Amino acid sequence: MVKVYAPASSANMSVGFDVLGAAVTPVDGALLGDVVTVEAAETFSLNNLGRFADKLPSEPRENIVYQCWERFCQELGKQIPVAMTLEKNMPIGSGLGSSACSVVAALMAMNEHCGKPLNDTRLLALMGELEGRISGSIHYDNVAPCFLGGMQLMIEENDIISQQVPGFDEWLWVLAYPGIKVSTAEARAILPAQYRRQDCIAHGRHLAGFIHACYSRQLELAAKLMKDVIAEPYRERLLPGFRQARQAVAEIGAVASGISGSGPTLFALCDKPDTAQRVADWLGKNYLQNQEGFVHICRLDTAGARVLEN
């Protein structure tokens, strides 16, 4: 039996639309991510467990884990009879890389079960392909950090899909999921087809400056450059209370904040534990909309997806 855990991730990070993402893990030790188990069997089967299992498609072939198994078998050129279990701990349409968690855990578990026939680059390419079936286009800003850990910059040149960017140990990521769903496809459809030249220049300046600040260890500068002129101005209308929440967390002391992925989760970066706790408390009282919502104080997950049992 192989059991693989794949962590949540926060894509875009305001400054890097479709090209930046970070894996995150709660500081209290909770597992914020999906778990997939693979066992040898006579025929294929898939069982769904976990807090959000009831939100998965009722038709098994529509389940992304089934599609991962099917595509992996196709890649190897043979049917691999296994019993798979998906522990769905991540809310769907949350902006925390929920589909990436399932895809990464499923493909990594299959690869481990079969003795690692695929290298990490090929495996990551498959992960992007499968996750793209749900989001509508192939982009690696969730699957790359989820699989590899840390903060990842998408390269997609010279046979390199992504490379790690140094993060800041001081940063605490407060992630608030309000409990409502925003589909990635809907959030992408709301974006303009063309952008003004001044917005393109600002975006390039912010992203280049942010990467430079990370490598030159300028924490304050990096946080100041986390601005979004590409997606947030258009997507915030999908998120009730988002603008007020951003203003409130800034007043409490967050050094940066924005939409995690395509939303509705809000991320707020803090450089002090007491500030992070006060931000988390405010968001818990004011940004959450129902019982499915949650707030976690996280750090970068530098390990990425990992085998829990083998």
Swiss-Prot record:
It holds the Pfam family GHMP_kinases_C. GO terms for biological process: threonine biosynthetic process. ATP binds at residues 91-101. It is found in: Cytoplasm. It catalyses: L-homoserine + ATP = O-phospho-L-homoserine + ADP + H(+). Keywords: Amino-acid biosynthesis, ATP-binding, Cytoplasm, Kinase, Nucleotide-binding, Threonine biosynthesis, Transferase. Pathway: Amino-acid biosynthesis; L-threonine biosynthesis; L-threonine from L-aspartate: step 4/5. GO terms for cellular component: cytoplasm. It is an enzyme of class 2 (transferase). GO terms for molecular function: ATP binding; homoserine kinase activity. It comes from the Bacteria. Its EC number is 2.7.1.39. Catalyzes the ATP-dependent phosphorylation of L-homoserine to L-homoserine phosphate. Belongs to the GHMP kinase family. Homoserine kinase subfamily. This is Homoserine kinase. It comes from Escherichia coli O6:K15:H31 (strain 536 / UPEC). The lineage of its organism: Bacteria, Pseudomonadati, Pseudomonadota, Gammaproteobacteria, Enterobacterales. The gene is thrB.
